[in-house]
């Protein structure tokens, strides 16, 4: 598969450059070409370059290439256009190519980018050795999407097309499954972990659209094939030495291999039409989907010297574990939109969905220390899941009041989930703790109501206000469950979850004059969480947040354009009712931004921007757990100049500076970065 991926990747990048060749060779009035290049950019990094790359998606050292290449060719019988980008060294490639000849058309799209990750774990400032541990490897994931579509216009309103898509992910990323780190008698989950990923997706799609007796008819048939190979690495760390089992367990290594693969087949049919002199729009759609997935998993445990071991009480040596799941869904959607008067718009939508899922798995385990590759016990599981989902929505818009627009929306969803689980334990040493049967009926509902409006009582004043209420309830009802034969007999013990939220936002904009236009915005959210588990009292938790934003546009002279903003984000989280001590958490971030554009003359332009963010949220909860809260200072500065000696040619040197300084009691990874680069653009035709 990697050979196929490399071939498609080569074809995609080659198409970007080859498609540009005709535009460079053709020289007549029908051709328009422009190019913006980055001959060179160099990032000088002092400090944690991995965190810098993860924050800004900019690779250290040198990158360069084509930032944007546009080409267009038109004549009565044939037209083509392209838009491409290729930054070497940063894994950033993009190309869009469109060609039409008569009723035939072809679209080609290629996009690839690289996402960077920091390999640093968490921080516990009371540790002297293993706080903020960093992996000894760089983590980056290349993500790409290739699509080609070709088709033909059937008539003025209809067309048929076939497309092929390929997506892949290749590389490694950090994971938040942080490992246990032990110093003395204290253990905290702050050790870094990472995962290798090799994923391929192929999608084949056939689409047809036409108009039949006033109805627009759309049909689509697709087949998606996917396969992923991943390997997760987790290493526990400890300052305690020795060969005692408990001490060796503190330095264990776990490696997990997972290979899920499957296919998704779906069919969709949609009908819609306008009627009653375009005052009523109605639509009906149906979708059928079938998902079939298989997975192979191996989980192995080692000591710190990578010798195979079975160290933990519930050994994590699982060999050749397999699962097979399939799911069927039927979805119906109906919508109706009416315009009874010019100032009124009423819409409604209804959705019904039936879903059935069946699955089974085997989980073999080797509990001998060291492992002897003989399966001691196998857990066999099966699941049967039936879900019915209904959804309704109503919208109302009114513009009958001068300088005013009012709207309201209401959404409701009901879900009925019937889940049957069955697990048995077989083998040389079966475990009664792993045997259980349960049937659960889980009804849930969700409601969202929104009301708001836009008001302009005077030309210089514009106001927008919105209020929203949310409610969600999930009642877990175990209709039948085997009696507990041990601590692990039940896979879940939740009884109920209830979430209620209120939101409001307001924005006021002033336009007293053209050269100065300020605006103020306030966003408020109050959310309550009510949870209840078996044999325990209800826990109530709440989060209250405020976001204040001030924006400004200033044009003191025709050749100077200034924008600025200030944002203050505050949140407060506390458990008002709980069975144990849960500390209150307060957080806040202040951000300032300023940008300036100065046009000296038609040939010389200067631009600059400054961003400063400050977070002071360190909450020292080390006595009962990990410290919480982001605590940092961040500065981003950009400065550039654009010189246009000729109408179709320009040069632009640029400079950027990035600073990140964290409170080392909460986070590690400071950096200072200086970036210098040169941009050039050329247009002809």
Short names for language-model regions:
Residues 2-12:
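Bacterial N-terminal signal peptides that target proteins for export
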Residues 5-6, 19, 647:
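Intrinsically disordered, low-complexity repeat segments enriched in small/polar residues
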Residues 11-22:
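Bacterial N-terminal signal peptides
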Residues 23-27:
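Sec/Tat signal peptide C-region and signal peptidase I cleavage site
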Residues 28-34, 41-685:
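Gram-negative and organellar
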């Amino acid at each position: 598969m990697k050979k196929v991926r490399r071939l498609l990747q080569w074809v995609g990048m080659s198409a970007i450059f080859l498609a540009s060749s005709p535009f460079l060779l053709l020289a007549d009035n029908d051709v328009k070409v422009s190019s913006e290049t980055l001959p060179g950019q160099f990032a000088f990094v002092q400090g944690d370059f991995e965190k810098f790359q993860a924050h800004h998606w900019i690779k250290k050292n040198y990158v360069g290439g084509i930032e944007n290449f546009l080409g267009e060719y038109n004549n009565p019988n044939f037209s083509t256009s392209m838009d491409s980008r290729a930054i070497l060294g940063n894994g950033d490639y993009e190309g869009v190519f469109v060609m039409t000849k008569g009723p035939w058309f072809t679209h080609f799209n290629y996009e690839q980018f690289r996402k960077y990750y920091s390999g640093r774990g968490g921080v516990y400032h009371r540790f002297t050795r293993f706080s903020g541990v960093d992996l000894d490897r760089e983590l980056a994931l290349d993500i790409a999407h290739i699509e080609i579509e070709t088709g033909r216009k059937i008539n003025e309103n209809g067309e048929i097309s076939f497309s092929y898509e390929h997506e892949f992910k290749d590389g490694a990323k950090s994971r938040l499954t942080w490992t246990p780190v032990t110093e003395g008698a204290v253990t905290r989950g702050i050790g870094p972990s990472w995962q290798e990923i090799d994923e391929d997706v192929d999608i084949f799609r056939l689409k047809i659209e036409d108009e039949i007796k006033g109805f627009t008819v759309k049909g689509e048939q697709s087949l998606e094939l996917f396969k992923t190979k991943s390997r997760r690495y987790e290493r526990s760390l400890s300052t305690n030495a020795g060969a005692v089992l408990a001490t060796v367990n503190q330095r264990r290594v776990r490696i997990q291999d997972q290979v899920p693969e499957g296919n998704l087949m779906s069919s969709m049919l949609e009908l819609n039409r306008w009627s009653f002199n375009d005052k009523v729009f109605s639509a009906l759609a149906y979708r059928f989907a079938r998902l079939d997935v298989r997975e192979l998993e191996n989980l192995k445990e080692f000591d710190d010297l990578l010798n195979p071991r079975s160290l933990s009480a519930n050994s994590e040596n699982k060999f050749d574990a397999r699962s097979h799941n399939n799911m069927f869904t039927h979805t119906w959607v109906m919508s109706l939109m009416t315009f009874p008067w010019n100032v009124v718009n009423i819409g409604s939508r209804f959705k019904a969905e039936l879903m059935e899922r069946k699955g089974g798995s085997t989980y073999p385990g080797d509990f001998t220390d060291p492992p002897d590759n003989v399966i001691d016990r196998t857990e066999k599981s099966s699941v049967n899941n039936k879900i019915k989902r209904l959804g309704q929505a109503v919208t109302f818009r009114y513009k009958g009041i001068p300088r005013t627009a009012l709207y309201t929306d209401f959404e409701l969803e009901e879900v009925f989930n019937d889940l049957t689980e069955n697990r048995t334990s077989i083998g040389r040493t079966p475990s009664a703790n792993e045997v259980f049967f349960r049937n659960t009926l889980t009804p849930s509902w969700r409601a969202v109501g929104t009301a708001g409006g836009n008001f302009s009582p005077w030309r210089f004043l514009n106001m927008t206000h919105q209020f929203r209420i949310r409610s969600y309830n999930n009642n877990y009802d175990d209709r039948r469950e085997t009696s507990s034969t041990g601590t692990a007999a039940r896979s879940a013990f939740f009884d109920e979850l209830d979430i209620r939220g209120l939101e409001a936002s307001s924005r006021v904009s002033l336009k007293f004059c053209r050269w100065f236009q300020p605006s103020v915005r306030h966003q408020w959210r109050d959310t309550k969480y009510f949870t209840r588990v078996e044999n325990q009292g209800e826990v109530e938790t709440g989060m209250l947040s405020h976001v204040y934003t001030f924006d400004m546009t200033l044009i003191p002279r025709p050749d100077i354009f200034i924008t600025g903003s200030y944002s203050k984000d505050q949140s407060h989280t506390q458990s008002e009712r709980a069975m144990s001590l849960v500390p209150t958490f307060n957080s806040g971030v202040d951000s300032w931004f300023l940008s300036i554009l100065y046009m000296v003359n038609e040939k010389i332009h200067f631009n600059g921007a400054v961003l400063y963010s400050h977070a002071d949220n360190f909450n020292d909860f080390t006595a009962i757990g990990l410290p919480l809260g982001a605590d940092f200072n961040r500065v981003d500065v950009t400065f550039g100049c654009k010189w246009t000696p000729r109408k179709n040619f320009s040069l632009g040197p640029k400079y950027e500076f990035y600073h990140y300084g964290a409170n080392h009691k909460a986070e590690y990874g400071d950096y200072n970065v200086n970036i210098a680069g040169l941009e050039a653009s050329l247009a002809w035709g």
